[in-house]
């Protein structure tokens, strides 16, 4: 299991576009129903900082996520948007869960 946490801050005017791009990723993931991918995204109280939490069964699942058309669109538009704070990626170790 690979757990990845990514956090970044968009410009305020891009936040709603980013939310829609994230919704498109979720919709595509629901349509393929891959058992090895659990994807969540959160908007922090400032309204422009996003945190993504990806639970990936293996590297193949990670590649599936990154190959989605919706993910590619999200990634391209995010980098083109002139972020306030660039993404910080951390690989987490699960200690406990319910």
Which stretches of residues belong to each language-model region?
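Intrinsically disordered, low-complexity segments enriched in polar/charged residues with Gly/Pro
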Residues: 15-16, 26-30, 41-43
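Phenylalanine-focused residue identity feature
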Residues: 14, 50, 71-74
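Short, surface-exposed ligand-recognition loops at beta-strand->loop->(often short) alpha-helix junctions
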Residues: 9-20
